[in-house]
Curated annotation (Swiss-Prot):
It comes from the Eukaryota. Residues 332-402 are annotated as: Disordered. PANTHER family: SIMILAR TO PREDICTED GENE ICRFP703B1614Q5.5 (PTHR14343:SF3), VWFA DOMAIN-CONTAINING PROTEIN (PTHR14343). This is Uncharacterized protein C11orf16 homolog. InterPro entries: DUF4537. Residues 393-402 have a biased composition (Pro residues).
């Protein structure tokens, strides 16, 4: 086992006991937002450096790579810390739809590339509708919502709009009847516009509930709703920020689960990230290393010991083609003694049974049975009448040995 690169840090793949980093006192303050859908270590590290930023895997993996580059901030929300109170449409897991929410002040998280939003309480309670709660989301999952300044919509624009009677969930759609006057048409004076949604429904939506989005945002929203594996990944899961003292980590594997997935939140198990790289990037995830016993058990199951099966019967050597069969029979009845003892034993066998057996010294094999003797009378076990002794001649049958 090699020594650890830094004192107090566990060795990758081998250590089963790690050192837990004690969190500094933050005046007993507890984050007010709900981190139930995030990885548990995200709530254990609010004191990390503010230049550590959260980023999401481009392949929609739930575990997030961490980078040590400065976050540019939310341009449409102004400077960092001034986003509190703004109304937005935030995408909420696990359904992937957008809901009306309000941004809460959290400057520390904004500097790292995340936002705290509070979803509006639904007018009609139901199992599918979200309750009023606070969540941590990413800027790319937030759409500006300004009821007083509607966007001038026209035919073919990509929007987010509610299609249900309750108007709680917002989905991607395309405007069929816009507000601007086209060639040969009059300007629409209606308070509703017609939107064709991604699920094939066409509905008239109030103008104040429709929000224009860029085509890239619209395309990403459609892909998340249409691809089942994307919805199951729960890509809004936050991960521990990168520790700058250990150097950057990169790469992500999604081909199998790690040996111990207790360090991930339950929704992330279907698309778990590489445990070795995630744990080696931050000392806070030390207690989740898998023990040595589980690794050894897995290795034992993968590499079973081969079983040696003896041959059913001795086969006679009829020619040069059957030399491997004769050699195999000889190896089963011979021991690991020296070559000189084997030669003495063969000479004694020749002297003891000159009439019933013949020895082929050229190929160094077991005695050859005569043609008149049936092979079915013999077995790979030792005959009862044979006197097995290596340091003396074998007596004839019926006479005791010396």
């Amino acid at each position: 086992m090699q020594p650890s690169a830094s004192p107090g840090l566990p060795l990758p793949k081998y250590c089963s006991v790690a050192t837990t980093v004690k969190a500094p006192d933050l005046h007993g303050a507890v984050p007010p937002w709900d981190m139930s859908f995030t990885c548990p270590f995200a709530t254990q590290a609010p004191w990390l450096a503010t230049h550590c930023t959260f980023t999401r895997c481009t392949a929609c993996c739930p575990c997030l790579h961490t980078v040590d580059r400065p976050w540019p901030g939310l341009r449409w929300l102004g400077r960092v810390g001034a986003a509190g109170g703004s109304w937005v449409l935030a995408r909420k897991e696990p359904d992937g739809f957008y809901y009306l929410a309000q941004i809460k002040a959290a400057p520390e998280l904004e500097k790292r590339g995340a936002l705290v939003v509070e979803f509006e309480a639904p007018l009609v309670t139901g199992l599918e509708l979200p309750a009023q709660q606070q969540r941590v989301v990413f800027p790319e999952d937030v759409i500006q919502f300004s009821p007083s300044v509607p966007h001038s919509l026209q035919l073919g624009d990509k929007v987010l709009a509610p299609w249900e009677p309750g108007q709680q969930r917002y989905g991607p759609g395309t405007v069929l009847v816009g507000l601007k006057k086209q060639k040969g048409q009059r300007a629409s004076k209606e308070k509703e516009i017609t939107v064709h949604f991604w699920n094939g429904k066409t509905t008239k939506v109030p103008l104040g509930s429709v929000r224009w989005v860029p085509p890239t945002v619209w395309k990403k929203a459609v892909e998340r709703l249409q691809a089942p594996h994307t919805r199951d990944c729960h890509s809004s899961c936050l991960w521990v920020p990168h520790c700058s003292q250990l150097g950057p980590r990169a790469g992500c594997t999604t081909h199998r689960h790690p040996l111990d997935s207790s360090f991930l939140c339950p929704p992330c198990l279907s698309c778990a990230c590489c445990q070795l790289q995630c744990q080696s990037s931050c000392p806070l995830v030390g207690p989740s290393w898998w023990p040595l016993t589980r690794t050894s058990e897995l290795t034992t199951r993968k590499l079973p010991e081969p079983e040696v099966k003896p041959t059913a019967q001795l086969l006679p050597l009829q020619g040069p083609k059957e030399e491997p069969v004769a050699e195999l029979s000889y190896n089963m009845f011979s021991s690991s003694s020296s070559s000189s003892e084997e030669e003495n034993s063969e000479s004694h066998l020749e002297m003891g049974l000159p009439l019933r057996q013949m020895v082929s010294r050229a190929v160094n094999t077991d005695p050859i049975l005569s043609e008149t003797t049936s092979l079915q009378q013999y077995s790979p076990h030792k005959p009862e009448w044979r006197y097995w002794r290596r340091n003396g001649p074998e007596p004839p049958p019926g006479k005791p040995g010396r």
